[in-house]
Amino acid sequence: MLLPEIDEKATVKRCKRKLREYPRWREIAHDSAEQKITQEFTFMPRGGSGVNKPVENIAVRRVDALSELEAIEQAVNGLYRPDYRRILIEKYLAYPPQPNWKIAQAIGFERTAFQELLKHSILAFAELYRNGQLVVER
């Protein structure tokens, strides 16, 4: 069986979008329930289509966020090449994220060679994230 042909440009775009979500998922996963729940007194009846369950909503969002964080971290940590892991961690997972030139300088690559290495690390991530869910085939 031959490997399917991958649309690299679309796959890289999807992966970058997913990796850029990481800080948001981290914030959601570590939100405090105390910050979200406040008592409000009003004489107006509640509107909407159902009962508001803020504690349940927070718990569900936190579980979803933890699941997403785990999937991203598992894919990054599963990369075979240490330089791929380092690039993705420093660029997308670390706070604050490092600019490309700084990462390239730290690992000893020229800017153009680094861009190619970044692309390959992102494509490798795509294959590992949730069994290739981010891969776009032609």
Swiss-Prot record:
Keyword Transport: yes
Record's keyword terms, sorted: Transport
InterPro entries linked: ArpU-like
Domain of life where this protein originates: Viruses
Its job: May be involved in the regulation of muramidase export.
Protein name: Putative autolysin regulatory protein ArpU
Organism per entry: Streptococcus phage O1205 (Streptococcus bacteriophage phi-O1205)
Organism ancestry: Viruses, Duplodnaviria, Heunggongvirae, Uroviricota, Caudoviricetes
